[in-house]
Amino acid sequence: MKKLVLSALLACSLFGADMMYSEGVKDVYADATSTKSIGRLLPTNAVKILQTSGDRVKLAVQGYQNPAVPNVVYFSDFARVIAVAFSKTANPEIKVLQKGKDGKWDKVETIVYASKDGFTSDLKGLFNKGETLYKESCGVCHGLHATTHYNANQWPSLLKSMVNRTAIQKEDQWVVIEYLQKHSSDVNVDKK
């Protein structure tokens, strides 16, 4: 009987809280019915799907927040790799899970809503897409830089300065940026 109850609890937790990744930039909302976006979730960032209601999902997003920048939740506690960014007028509920050292980089969680499409469980596939777009588009004018040639904070401005001379579509730019940042010299998720 004990095994049956534990199995049922495990199954419920797995089905009720699926870990997924955004495939592209997604608008986020304060509740299930709001039509006004309060921010954006960037691609390749993990979310826990808590509930589905109609065409919306309720998401838990964990990350790090610099208390000096209250409208951004970052992927890591040392680099500006954005997970979700809120508008300056938004007032999202952000729960501190663990206080950071010296008043910086608190581990946080926020609950937001988004359209239920555009999520995948295949993070490797998203990184492969970013890598392919980078390799096929960014080595045409110059030698291709290794992803570890720059740190996470440098990649967004470098790519944005050259992206207009590539075939990378606007909707894929953040997939490439997040791939580069998460495989940079200081973050490099493959080495963790």
Each PLM stretch: what is its role?
Residues 166-192:
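C-terminal capping alpha-helices of c-type cytochrome domains
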Residues 143-166:
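Gly/Gly-Pro-rich "capping" loops immediately C-terminal to redox-active cysteine motifs
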Residues 107-131:
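Electrostatic cytochrome c docking/interface patches
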Residues 39-114:
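SH3/SH3-like beta-barrel superfamily modules
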Residues 4-13:
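Sec-dependent N-terminal signal peptides
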Residues 19-49, 53-54, 117:
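Beta-loop motif signature
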Residues 134-145, 176, 180:
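The canonical Cys-X-X-Cys-His
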